[in-house]
Structure formats: structure tokens, C-alpha cells
Amino acid sequence: MARRSAFPAAALWLWSILLCLLALRAEAGPPQEESLYLWIDAHQARVLIGFEEDILIVSEGKMAPFTHDFRKAQQRMPAIPVNIHSMNFTWQAAGQAEYFYEFLSLRSLDKGIMADPTVNVPLLGTVPHKASVVQVGFPCLGKQDGVAAFEVDVIVMNSEGNTILQTPQNAIFFKTCQQAECPGGCRNGGFCNERRICECPDGFHGPHCEKALCTPRCMNGGLCVTPGFCICPPGFYGVNCDKANCSTTCFNGGTCFYPGKCICPPGLEGEQCEISKCPQPCRNGGKCIGKSKCKCSKGYQGDLCSKPVCEPGCGAHGTCHEPNKCQCQEGWHGRHCNKRYEASLIHALRPAGAQLRQHTPSLKKAEERRDPPESNYIW
């Protein structure tokens, strides 16, 4: 650790401020190489007292002499001035030693004047081995002039759980606050804090809390006027103006998404989805899904879905007449036209000079005695 100066006599008022924030007491013991350090760096000292010099508070786990008699100092300590909104302390656990801290209390006793004190570190954790800044904030609300009392209680322990440093119990400190004025004022219940910035209530934002916050946001040019309430432009409605109020009718399953505008399903176009992209209509229940491209329903195929499909097929002696219905050539029968009539039966049943027709009753009756009929197929 670099050598730091003793507390300068010219800054007696800073002594009181230091005690206001962190009037620590230390356990007696010999200095240790691996130990705890706490100080105010030169930059923060310049802000507070006008000159740059590190101010040592804790060295090698022991308090600087000026911090010992807190009770006597508390009787004459002044309130933290209006222009000081926060104070930075730097701390470090030197070497390999581990130190744990906990902020037991950060509490304002005058919440109409000042909110609870703040720190920029977790309320419970370890003191870092690298020099790090702990900022204690005094958030005046700016609602009124006055002096706010507050409480800061922190404890530091070693790795064995023994208390090394702790603020005195029931120590009360004071901060001077004043009413602030924000240029343009704060609207919708917002108030001007000590930094002359509007702090807005839930549901509003903006420099003057003039903008309402809608979740989800207003769409299609809608205006959020109060939290969760949108005023929609002509042609739109809904909680967040997400729905179009269409006078235009969208045909063929189209959806109106903007006044006068339709989103068309695949295969359709036009202002009202009235134009098919297929010059020739798709047959047998097929749907146009692109330019001259049909999506066929089950049992049909082809560019226009005009060809029926038979599974597994009608073979070399039949043609597919309807989905899964084969029309067999003369002399053939069966589900897939793969069975042939006997020649003697054909000649016996066919009159002289006549041709066998596919649906000849006498032939069909003769075959029904030999082969059971197969339904849903044409012989």
C-alpha cells in the first residue's frame, strides 16, 4: 500500500461528514501485511474540501485516530450540505486475506424529504482485492426544504466470521435537502428531484413526464395518452391499434391488415384477393399456390390436378379412372387389372360377332361365382 497522509487539520468539517457516513470502530490488534484498507481518494477529496490528497480512514485493519470518539463528534456534526449528493470511498483487501461485508441498514427516517440511502455494491459480499469504489448516495426528493435524518449500518468480518469493523449502533446522520424546480415543470404526478430532473411515476416518461407508456406499444400511428390506453388513427382499432377496420372485403380467405389492403393466401392476388395466379383453375379440389402451380387434393395429380391416382397402380392392362379405381381392358379384371378371363369362358358367353363389354351382366355373374367382387373398383 502507498503511504497516505494523516487527516489534515484544515478539514475539520470533513471529519464530521466522514463520521456521518462511516464512523467505524476497529478491534485492537497488531498490524497485518494482509489486511483491510479504506480511504477517500484524492479526486473525491478535491470535490469535498478543495485540494487533492488521499484521506486514510482504515489502514492494516485499524482505524485512523480521528475516528475513535464518534459519540462526542456526533453531538456537533453538521448536516451534509445541499450540494453533496453522494460520497465515494475506496476499499481493498490486501494480499490473500478475505473480508466479508454486509449493509445491515440503509434507511431514511424522513421519507418525505429523502429516500433511503443507496450504495453501488450488493448489500452482502466480499471486499475486493483490487482497489474499488463504494459510492453512498443521499437521494433528496426535491419536494420540500428540510433536513433528513438517515441511518447507515455496515459490518465487516474476516474469513473466520469475526467482526473487524462496524458502524456504531443507532447512529443517526443528517442531510440538508431543498425543494427543486425543473424548467417546464413535471406533469402527471412527477416530481422534481434535487438534480432538477423530473422523476416520473409508473406509466409515464419524458423530460417532463409528459409521455404515457403503453405496453404493448401503440401500433399503426396510435397515440398513447394514458398508461395502457391508445387513441387509434382512422381505420384502426384494438387495445394497441393492431386491428384494421376494413371497408374492403377480402375474398378467397384474404385478411385485411390495413384499410383497403388485403393479405392474400398463396396463389391469389389483387386488391381483394380476387385474382388467381393460375390461368386455368385447379381441378378436383386443388388449390393454386403459385403461378400456374396447383396443390392437389389426395387422390389427384398433374399440373391442374386432373389425373387420378391409383395405388399401387393399374398395371399394363388398365387405366386409373378415379382415385384408386381402375378401368380394365377387355379380358382382364381384378383390383389392379392383373387377372385374365379364361378364353373358353369368354367365347362361351360372347355372342357370335359381338364384342365383350366391360360390364356384361352374364360375364360378371359368371365371375362372381369364381372370384368375390372387389368393391370401389371398375372392372
From Swiss-Prot:
Residue positions with a glycan: 88, 245
Compartments in which it is found: Secreted
Primary location group: secreted
Highest taxon, organism lineage: Eukaryota
Disulfide bond entries: 140-177, 182-192, 186-198, 200-209, 214-224, 218-230, 232-241, 246-256, 250-262, 278-288, 282-294, 296-305, 310-320, 314-326, 328-337
GO MF terms held by the record: signaling receptor binding; Wnt-protein binding
Secretion signal span: 1-28
Database matches in PROSITE patterns: EGF_1, EGF_2, EGF_3, WIF
Alphabetical list of CDD domains matching this protein: EGF_CA
Record-annotated WIF domain positions: 38-177
GO BP: negative regulation of Wnt signaling pathway; positive regulation of fat cell differentiation; signal transduction; Wnt signaling pathway
Region spans: Disordered: 354-379
Keywords: Developmental protein, Disulfide bond, EGF-like domain, Glycoprotein, Repeat, Secreted, Signal, Wnt signaling pathway
GO cellular component, one term: extracellular region
Record's keyword annotation contains Mitochondrion: no
SMART domains: EGF, WIF
Stated role: Binds to WNT proteins and inhibits their activities. May be involved in mesoderm segmentation.
Assembly description: Interacts with MYOC.
Protein name (Swiss-Prot/TrEMBL): Wnt inhibitory factor 1
Native organism: Homo sapiens (Human)
Gene for this chain: WIF1
